[in-house]
């Protein structure tokens, strides 16, 4: 473990030395165009909402026709799934939301990331098998089998983004990941089922430099599907899920529903800034 932590610290130091605009992570990533933001804003808001952190912006997407349900399909205000006991949480910190749209057959499963200081490195950069990744895939598969009529998409931020990408590789479902962990597991047989997989990250976000040379991440993600944003966070951590989501929402002026919804999200912490 000490050697692994040394590697991680070295990588983060390397990231800290990257101060020029060209050294922002993924060398060939595209800057996200303003008129593309509306494609990803909803997923980013769901990824952010999974934290249920009262100190951060909550996006009331219920007003857009979405309902968070538990594993039995009942409306819930908490995460759809969390470990049932403290013993279970020791082996897996998996938490996720199931969002079902009331007027369509669309479902979005949003995996919670982690921003606890103690387990942040372990969750995002640890090397080796991971119980949360296996459990995430199992739960998505079970939902699809139980609801074959629904169109399922996965999303997540940080560790949650890694869980979403891994589930997509195994189960052939579209995935949208925000500031994701570089850890992506596709199994011994290198499962790479065809699906749309997109990564959106804020420039100089702490994991971007690591993802840019993490072997498995580079193998499964083409840089043509990786997009960088340059929102102004005014000194707040560039890894924040709610700031990235708000920036994308503020830029969604080509979608009337999202444009109107953005006016309800206050106070304004992030402006658009994309071109």
Q: What do these predicted regions represent?
A:
Residues 19-27, 103-106, 173-275:
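Serine hydrolase/lipase
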Residues 165-169:
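Short glycine-enriched nucleophile-adjacent loop
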Residues 1-6:
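Bacterial N-terminal signal peptides that target proteins for export
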Residues 9-11:
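Hydrophobic membrane-insertion alpha-helices, especially the h-region
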Residues 13-16:
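C-terminal motif of bacterial Sec signal peptides marking the signal peptidase cleavage site
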Residues 19-29, 38, 42, 51-154, ...:
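A conserved cap/lid and substrate-binding interface adjacent to the catalytic center
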Residues 155-160, 164:
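Gly/Ala-rich beta-loop-alpha elbow adjacent to hydrolase catalytic centers
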């Amino acid at each position: 473990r000490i050697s692994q932590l040394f590697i991680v610290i070295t990588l983060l130091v390397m990231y800290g030395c990257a101060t020029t605009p060209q050294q922002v992570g993924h060398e060939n990533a595209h800057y996200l165009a303003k008129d593309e933001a509306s494609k990803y804003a909803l997923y980013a808001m769901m990824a952010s909402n999974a934290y249920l952190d009262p100190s951060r912006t909550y996006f009331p997407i219920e007003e857009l026709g979405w309902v968070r349900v538990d594993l039995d399909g009942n409306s819930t205000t908490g995460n759809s799934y969390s470990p049932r006991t403290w013993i279970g949480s020791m082996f897996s910190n998996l938490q996720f939301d199931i969002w079902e749209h009331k007027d369509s057959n669309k479902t979005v499963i949003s995996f919670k990331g982690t921003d606890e200081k103690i387990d942040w490195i372990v969750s995002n950069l640890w090397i080796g098998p991971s119980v949360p990744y296996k459990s995430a895939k199992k739960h998505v598969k079970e939902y699809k089998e139980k609801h074959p009529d629904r169109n399922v998409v996965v999303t997540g931020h940080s560790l949650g983004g890694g869980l979403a990408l891994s589930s997509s590789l195994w189960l052939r479902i579209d995935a949208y990941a925000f500031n994701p962990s570089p850890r992506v597991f596709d199994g011994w047989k290198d499962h790479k089922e065809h699906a749309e997989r997109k990564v959106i990250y804020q420039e100089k976000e702490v994991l971007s430099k690591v993802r840019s040379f993490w072997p498995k991440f580079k193998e499964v993600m083409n840089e043509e599907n990786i997009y960088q944003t340059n929102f102004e966070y005014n000194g707040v951590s560039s890894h924040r899920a709610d700031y990235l989501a708000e920036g994308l929402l503020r830029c969604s002026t080509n979608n009337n529903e999202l444009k109107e919804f953005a006016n309800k999200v206050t106070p304004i912490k992030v402006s658009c800034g994309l071109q």
